[in-house]
Amino acid sequence: MARRCEICNKGVVAGVQYSHSHRQSKRTWAPNIKKVKAIVKGTPKTVHVCTRCLRSEKFKELYKKSLAKMQFNNCIFILHKNKG
């Protein structure tokens, strides 16, 4: 699965983890990415979206407007979440 959000472009970050004795080990932090079926420019598509963008008010407003008016011009709207 892609480790990058297609809306905010959030991706994997590398860094160093320190133990109690201050020994270092390299590690990565990955964002919480979900696969979502959405309508992009009028066509249904599977999109990788982080949970922060999925919960955002802007994203929810776009979804509500799309259901009310059924306008799909250059916007991403959720159809339903994939299970799994």
Curated annotation (Swiss-Prot):
InterPro entries: Bacterial_rp_bL28, Ribosomal_bL28, Ribosomal_bL28/bL31-like_sf, Ribosomal_bL28_bact-type, Ribosomal_bL28_sf. GO terms for biological process: translation. One of its GO terms (molecular function) is structural constituent of ribosome. Disulfide bonds: none annotated. Pfam families: Ribosomal_L28. GO terms for cellular component: ribonucleoprotein complex; ribosome. Gene3D superfamilies: Ribosomal protein L28/L24 (2.30.170.40). Keywords: Ribonucleoprotein, Ribosomal protein. Signal peptide: none annotated. It comes from the Bacteria. Belongs to the bacterial ribosomal protein bL28 family. HAMAP family: Ribosomal_bL28. This is Large ribosomal subunit protein bL28. It comes from Clostridium perfringens (strain 13 / Type A).
